[in-house]
C-alpha cells in the first residue's frame, strides 16, 4: 500500500477465524490524517469500486456478512469512522473457496485471455 501511495501506510489487519467451512471476514484499521465525513469516504469507495463487477460497497451501518457472499465471487465491503480514535475501520467479506481461490483464478484467466471479466462468475450467492 505504501508503494502505491508513495508514502508510509500503517494498517492493522485482523482476519476473523470462526468455525465455519467457508468464508473470510476481515477488519482493518487505519489512522486518518485529517477529519473526514462518512459521505467523503463513501464517495471515495464508490469512485474506487464503481467499475469493479464483484465489489459491493454496502449501505451505511451495514456490516459485511460471509453468508451474503457464500458461493459467489463477490466481496462485500464497508467502513466506519471512529471519531474518538481518529481511525477508519474497514470491513470485508469473501467466500474463500470462490473469490479467494477458484473464482479469482477464473476472473484472472478471463482478463488474461481477453474474455469478459465476469464470464462464468455471475452465479447468485447462496443466501438468502
Region roles according to the model:
Residues 1-90:
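C-terminal substrate-binding/catalytic lobe of Rossmann-fold NAD(P)-dependent oxidoreductases
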Residues 74-128:
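NAD(P)-dependent Rossmann-like dehydrogenase/reductase catalytic/cofactor-binding core
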